[in-house]
């Protein structure tokens, strides 16, 4: 909803054109759905869903050098998350990764 088919880590990252005619991106829950029990409000909301190119998506799941990326994503979403009733600090977000 917020990304316009661009990678939220770096809007210049390129991907291929999908069958729907849009640049292919992957949806990722910034706060993982596996953490839902730690939150009163649903994590499955637009404010918590980010758009990532396939490489950045894999990096967040499997990479070791993700602190800068998490900080950038957190800073871009913290206010939207609050508006959705989801309160989290960067320190706590990093614990899920």
Label each residue range with its predicted role:
Residues 97:
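PLD/PLD-like phosphodiesterase catalytic module centered on the HKD motif
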Residues 31-94:
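Polybasic, low-complexity binding patches
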Residues 1-28, 53-55:
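Short cysteine-rich loop/turn motifs with clustered Cys
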């Amino acid at each position: 909803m917020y990304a316009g088919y661009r990678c939220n880590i770096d809007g210049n990252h390129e991907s291929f054109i999908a069958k729907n005619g849009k640049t292919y991106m992957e949806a990722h829950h910034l706060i993982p759905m596996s953490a839902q029990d730690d939150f009163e409000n649903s994590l499955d909301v637009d404010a918590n869903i980010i758009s990532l190119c396939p490489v950045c998506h894999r990096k967040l799941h499997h990479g070791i050098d993700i602190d800068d990326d998490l900080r950038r994503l957190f800073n871009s979403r913290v206010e939207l998350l609050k508006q959705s009733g989801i309160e989290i600090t960067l320190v706590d977000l990093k614990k899920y990764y």
